[in-house]
Regions:
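Active-site- and interface-proximal helix/loop "cap" or "latch" segments in soluble metabolic
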Residues: 7-9, 14-123
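Sec-dependent signal peptide cleavage junction
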Residues: 1-3
């Protein structure tokens, strides 16, 4: 068919109780979530957590031995495949799904809020 895909992009932010700001960007294709990008400012640092990479030094403290950007990469791919609403959260704002916690054990409630908001804002 020669119909052009309907591509929409949206962006949103969420600020947590530590004052760290999450930015979520999404790309929708024909109404379906195709791309998700999540990043967050790091307290007292002039680079984002993604930009800090291994220098953010979460790996040592991580139950699954993964740095922040690695856990977020996993989460982004999961959301692209299964959507935000497929993720169940516990009271701490962390995922309960085993197929999420295998790659992402950090608190993600704010990230999910930002992604949902970005989807709403997609134009």
């Amino acid at each position: 068919s020669n119909s052009k895909a309907d591509i929409k992009e949206g962006k949103a932010t969420y600020t947590n109780d530590k004052g760290e700001v999450t930015t979520a960007k999404v790309k929708l294709k024909n109404g379906d979530l195709e791309e998700v990008e999540i990043d967050e400012t790091a307290q007292g640092k002039d680079k984002s957590k993604k930009a800090l990479g291994n220098d953010y030094q979460m790996k040592q403290a991580s139950k699954i031995g993964k740095e922040w950007y690695e856990q977020i990469d996993f989460l982004e791919k999961y959301i692209e495949k299964k959507g935000v609403d497929s993720i169940k959260l516990n009271k701490e704002g962390k995922a309960e799904n085993n197929d999420v916690t295998s790659g992402c054990t950090i608190r993600i409630d704010g990230f999910l809020k930002a992604v949902k908001e970005a989807e709403k804002n997609a134009k």
